[in-house]
Amino acid sequence: MSRVKFLSKICFFAALLAIDILAFTPKSPAIIENSWDKANHFLAFFVLYILLYLGYEVKILKNLALLLAFGVQIELVQAFLPNRSFSLLDIVADMIGAAFGVIVVEILKRIYYGKSKASF
């Protein structure tokens, strides 16, 4: 296993843990509680997609399905937490971030490897 794959896997699971901790605290930490909530979701899932791709190189749809399941799981748990609620818009922001991750990965693959390595 290459060093990049190994480090990406570690960072992916560290990011999952950090996101879960932030998502499951009864009240949002003051540092992230602002009007940029959807941007936080976008950025988190953008980074998660990149790390997932670098660590596992699974097909795009499987990666997106995994991240969708993670996003839905977060929102379902938050529906039962005090001072938290289920938000469909958070899931939309998650998926837009992940989709942007797909676009960035595919553009970089075309730049570095040519059209033959790109998925679309």
Predicted regions and their residues:
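"…centered on the first transmembrane helix and the immediately adjacent amphipathic helix/loop
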Residues: 1-54, 67
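Cleavable Sec-type N-terminal signal peptides
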Residues: 10, 14, 18, 92-95, ...
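Alpha-helical transmembrane segments of multi-pass membrane proteins
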Residues: 19-23, 49, 70-75, 98, ...
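Short helix-capping/hinge motifs at transmembrane helix termini and TM-loop junctions
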Residues: 25-26, 56-57, 82-83, 109
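Interfacial helix-loop-helix junctions of multi-pass membrane proteins
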Residues: 32-38, 76-96
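Membrane-interfacial alpha-helical segments at the cytosolic side of multi-pass membrane proteins
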Residues: 43-58, 98-109
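Membrane-embedded catalytic cores of phosphoryl/pyrophosphoryl-handling enzymes
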Residues: 55-56, 60-78
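Short, charged juxtamembrane terminal tails flanking transmembrane helices
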Residues: 113-120
